[in-house]
Design a protein with these regions (language model features):
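Carbohydrate-associated surface elements
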Residues: 147, 169
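Membrane-proximal helix-turn-helix segments that form the acceptor-binding/catalytic region
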Residues: 120-141
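Nucleotide-activated donor-binding/catalytic signature segment of Leloir-type glycosyltransferases, i.e.
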Residues: 228-265
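Active-site proximal beta-strand in glycosyltransferases
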Residues: 95-115, 121
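Aromatic "clamp/platform" in nucleotide-sugar-dependent glycosyltransferases that forms part
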Residues: 271
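Short hydrophobic beta-strand element within catalytic cores of glycosyltransferases
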Residues: 288-291
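Short glycine/serine-rich donor-binding loops of glycosyltransferases
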Residues: 256, 276-279
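Conserved donor-binding/catalytic core segment of Leloir-type glycosyltransferases
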Residues: 179-201, 206-212, 222-223
Length: 291
């Protein structure tokens, strides 16, 4: 099939959306012709916004949903596609096409805003309207959880018949063997924290847990991946920090593999996660997760 792929994020970049876009995009490419339609459109609209508003107004793609709808509707007419897969509700809301349209997501705006609590009421109202338009317009919706599905039905009156729940995976590209090692009983317990948003993912709580264990005489280490503590930490040889691991880089992927291989527990007292790909990654390595 010829598949049009609409996404504001680059589906070729493994760092976007925890690698789910990349896994979806490349998996489809194995058997179909998949085109990232209008890959420059989002960037061009962003540049237009910056040129006109400088730094006086934050860029929110929701404000350009009508423009996105017009641009993508025109682009889709230039080639014969069998299906459209859309990642962003602000792309789908005003899209005009006879081609079957699939919307894929991990949450609804209603659920998202329960945690993020946007203060701009007019923007919140607009986002709710766009989400509703997208949900009603599309032919099929794929969510990764019953949680998101229930919200779509209850908060946006979505038709249950057109929603499918497909759980996402770990998005690990290499088939790297995991050593079957059993740590000695007196070996340190290696704790792992993975998260880009230190506060939302509970980074301070993880440090508290680590220091509490050390204070009780437990031998342990802590590896922090994806962010840095906002405060300066006393020098501790048992804490390793990797602010960013680039999954498009083979050396970084191997480093990520090495970190997961030697970890005993993932600790992630997160306050907000739509699905939690990191838990899938931990499961792939047989690592118990503590929330």
């Amino acid at each position: 099939m010829n598949i049009a792929f609409l996404s504001s994020s680059n589906p070729n970049d493994q760092n976007n959306w925890s690698g789910t876009l990349y896994s979806l995009y490349t998996s489809l490419q194995k058997k179909h012709r998949v085109i990232w339609v209008g890959e420059t459109v989002f960037a061009e609209v962003w540049e237009f916004h910056k040129a006109n508003f400088k730094n006086n107004e934050t860029f929110f793609p929701e404000n350009y949903a009508l423009l996105f709808g017009k641009l993508f509707s025109d682009l889709l007419k230039k080639e014969c596609y069998d299906v459209i897969i859309c990642r962003d509700y602000f792309f789908a809301a005003y899209l005009v096409s006879d081609i079957p349209l699939i919307y894929i997501g991990d949450t609804t705006f209603h659920l998202f805003n329960q945690y993020m609590n946007w203060q701009d009421k007019s923007l919140t109202k607009l986002a709710e309207q766009l989400e509703s338009l997208a949900i009603q317009k599309v032919d099929k919706i794929i969510y990764c959880s019953e949680w998101a599905k229930q919200s779509a039905m209850q908060d946006y009156n979505a038709d249950a018949e057109k929603i499918e729940v497909v759980e996402f995976g770990a998005n690990i590209t290499e088939n790297i063997p995991i050593p079957d090692n059993v740590s000695p009983i007196n070996a340190p317990c290696n704790l792992l924290f993975i998260g880009r948003n230190w506060n939302m993912k509970g980074g301070n709580k993880v440090l508290e847990i680590y220091h509490n264990l050390k204070g009780r005489g437990f031998q342990c280490t802590l590896t922090i991946v994806g962010s840095e503590p906002p405060m300066s930490l006393p020098n501790d040889p048992n804490i390793e920090i990797y602010p960013f691991i680039d999954k498009t880089n083979s050396n970084d992927r191997l480093k990520f593999h090495e970190i997961l291989t030697r970890s005993h527990f993932l600790i992630l007292p997160t306050r907000f996660d739509c699905f939690g790909i990191v838990f899938c990654e931990a499961c792939a390595y047989g690592i118990p997760s503590l929330m």
